[in-house]
Curated annotation (Swiss-Prot):
Top-level taxon: Bacteria
Protein name (Swiss-Prot/TrEMBL): UDP-N-acetylmuramate--L-alanine ligase
Gene: murC
Keywords, comma-separated and alphabetical: ATP-binding, Cell cycle, Cell division, Cell shape, Cell wall biogenesis/degradation, Cytoplasm, Ligase, Nucleotide-binding, Peptidoglycan synthesis
Source species of the chain: Acidovorax ebreus (strain TPSY)
Residues that bind ATP: 112-118
Length: 477
């Protein structure tokens, strides 16, 4: 038998799906190293934990590694991958490494086109509040923990299940949530929506016979697969036939208040829920968590405390505060990772509910040319629901440009639709200045996208702070 695996190297360790696995393995006692194309707060955090990280890729970085972990974003000709194959070092896809982690615990996997990160974070928070000390691996930073991964001492591990590359079919959970099924990442499924739905059925059938599927039946595609699911099911949603159902839903500032009726096999008392998140889509995410909690016999008081005290996830409706507007007064700056029209519509609706009557300014960077092409008309519709739009070029994410699927084409189509006059900004680096200069008193500015626009809100804050310092110096003279 070959020597035991001791040193694991991650190619692309800064990725949201990679850094969490790396951190958990480090905490399990493995020697962990990794590389990424650019420096980032994620790399610096891993370094502070004792993980050796490198900026850039080179064959020398895998020295001493017993296994090399890659994500689907890493190309086959990456020098570290080539070196590993040449030296007969196992090259392990990220999803398979996550599967190995799940063997150590009872796995709860959260799948779906939208809402995975928030739902996974809520489940981890509820289990933590109940004293179950879960291990979790999340695709975003759980604010209360200051990280997107943690090695707990309890019997459960909570993970996101990624359908984008089909890798969720490697996982072996004992409980699985499907928040929704939507036409995204269709290239993985040959642009066949039926194949995508069947993949979710296959994912659910990866569970043992005693596993439980928790499904949102408000989503038509999820409802479609119900007859095909052979394991026990708990349904949730706003629909009348949902076993875990929310009624009397209302927005109260940036919170949602609602009543939950639980009829999943037994009749439990109704719950009066305060959720410290905005938007009806987050009510659905919370219902999934409430269904999980019922299956695990989590006490209601712990469940309600966790939902009311939830401090959110990085880049998911993340407030950067009320900032000074150039013409006097203040505007609210919010950041969100949403980059699909369905996600954007939900987030814009949440902003309208949380800040009624205020002008909503959307700063958006499309993500991937293929998604822009496939969802072009839906993007035009959802962008048109904002009061003002700042639009920049598509974040390619490694794709080649596609004719008529770029940022300018989207801006032209939005202009022709006539609902809003977009401002096109060639370079996303210029967006912070445009936001700082153009935001008015009372505006809600929402920066959305999964690409480099993620750095814009912090730069807006820095810019306005510098402007304020200069103004103070001018007044002092």
């Amino acid at each position: 038998m070959k020597q035991a695996i001791r040193h694991i190297h991650f190619v692309g360790i800064g990725g949201s799906g990679m850094c969490g696995i790396a951190e958990v393995l480090h905490n399990l006692g493995y020697v962990v190293s990794g590389s990424d194309l650019a420096d980032s707060p994620t790399l610096r955090r891993l370094q502070s934990l004792g993980v050796a990280t490198h900026v850039g890729h080179a064959a020398a970085h895998i020295a001493g590694a017993d296994a090399v972990v890659t994500s689907t974003a890493v190309q086959a000709d990456n020098p570290e991958v080539l070196a590993a194959r040449e030296r007969k070092i196992p090259v392990v896809p990220r999803a398979l490494m996550l599967t190995e982690l799940m063997r150590l615990r009872k796995g709860i996997a959260i799948a779906g086109a939208h809402g995975k990160t928030t739902t996974t974070s809520l489940v981890a928070s509820v289990l933590g509040e109940a004293g179950l000390d879960p291990t979790f691996v999340i695709g975003g930073r759980l604010n209360s923990a200051g990280t997107n991964a943690k090695l707990g001492q309890g019997e459960y591990i909570v993970v996101e299940a990624d359908e984008s590359d089909g890798s969720f079919l490697n996982l072996l959970p004992v409980m699985a949530v499907v928040t929704n099924i939507d036409a995204d990442h269709m290239e993985t499924y040959g642009h066949d929506f039926g194949r995508l739905k069947q993949a979710f059925v296959d994912f659910l059938h990866r569970m043992p016979f005693y596993g439980t599927a928790i499904l949102c039946i408000d989503n038509p595609a999820v409802r479609d697969i119900l007859p095909l699911v052979t394991c026990p099911v708990t349904s949730y949603g706003l629909s009348e036939d949902a076993e875990v159902r929310a009624v009397d839903v209302r927005a109260v500032g940036t919170q949602m208040h609602f009543t939950v009726q639980r009829r999943n096999g037994v009749t439990l008392p109704d719950l009066q829920v305060v959720l410290n998140l905005a938007g009806e889509h987050n009510v659905l995410n919370a219902l999934a968590v409430i269904a999980v909690a019922a299956e695990l016999n989590v006490p209601d008081d712990a469940l309600l405390r966790a939902l009311a005290g939830f401090t959110g996830v990085g880049r998911r409706f993340q407030r950067h505060g009320d900032l000074p507007a150039q013409g006097g007064g203040h505007f609210t700056l919010i950041e969100d990772y949403g980059h699909h029209p369905v996600e954007m519509a939900a987030t814009l609706a949440a902003a309208r509910g949380a800040y009624p009557g205020r002008r909503l300014v959307l700063a958006f960077q499309p993500h991937r040319y293929s998604r822009t092409r496939d969802c072009f008309e839906d993007f035009v519709k959802v962008l048109g629901t904002a009061d003002a739009v700042l639009l920049t070029e598509v974040y390619a994410a490694g794709e080649a440009p596609i004719v008529a699927a770029d940022g300018r084409s989207l801006a032209r189509a939005l202009r022709v639709a006539g609902t809003v006059e977009p401002v096109f900004i060639d370079n996303v680096a210029d967006m912070p200045q445009r936001i700082a200069a153009g935001a008015r008193d009372g505006d809600v500015v929402l920066c959305m996208g999964a690409g480099s626009i993620g750095g814009v809100p912090a730069k807006v804050v820095d810019l306005l702070q510098k402007n304020e310092l200069l103004a103070q110096e001018g007044r002092a003279q």
